[in-house]
Each structure stands twice: as structure tokens, then as C-alpha cells.
Amino acid sequence: MQEPEVIKILQEELKFTDQSIDKLKMYEIELLRANKKYNFIAKSTEGSIWSRHFLDSAQLVKYINFRQGSLSDLGSGAGFPGLVLAIYNQNFNFHVKLYEKSPVKRDFLDATINKLKINAELYPNVFDGIIESLSL
């Protein structure tokens, strides 16, 4: 599935805004740039970022109540699904917490969060802050 088809699904079925799509495009640029050096995603999937990574991550919006609370992405890696969900939720009072132990991946995530100006917080260890964020 090509980018235009995925964008149509994201907008029509999952209600991504034009602004969210623009941020996904910026995320794609940053990811491809970083991937040349760090291999965050398999080279064989670079041509299918929109269908394999963005759409797969975005499908979770059907099951999340973005009106309240937060979501934790443990072992965020290149930001899937956490960054995609943070991009989607920019119009809601909802917080995405990304947990990543790799300094290289954290640097990428931090730079991307700041560049895209999205509501996400990055933790350097999967255990930092997670106990406080769990509601039982």
C-alpha cells in the first residue's frame, strides 16, 4: 500500500488531521535520515514506512480513550507505536510516555519529539516513573 492510500485511511477511518499527517511526514524524514546511520528499521521496510510502521501503529487509536490518562510505550525503539500515537493525540488531553534504554534511540526520540512539538515524555529506563504512572 502506497503513502497516498495510507493517508486516506488515516484521515477517513482513523480521523488523523492534516496537521497530524504533516507531522508524520516530518517524522518519516527524520527516521530515514537517522536510519542511514543507526539502522532503526530494516532497510527493506524503508519503502513501506507508511503502511508497515505508521498505519500499523495508528490502528491502536480505535482502542484508546484519548480523552483522559496516558499511555506507556515500553522499549520505544524508533518510536512505534508511541510517537505515532502522540502525533495523533495532539488535540487531546492525553500524554504518551516513551521508555527507551538505548542512548542512541533516546537521542533520536528526544530530537523528534522536540522538532515535531508533540505531547510525549521520554524516560531513560523502562522502570523510571512507570510505577507512579500505573493505576491499579
Put a short name on every predicted segment:
Residues 2-66, 104-105, 111-118:
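Class I SAM-dependent transferase core
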Residues 58-136:
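Conserved SAM/SAH cofactor-binding pocket of Class I
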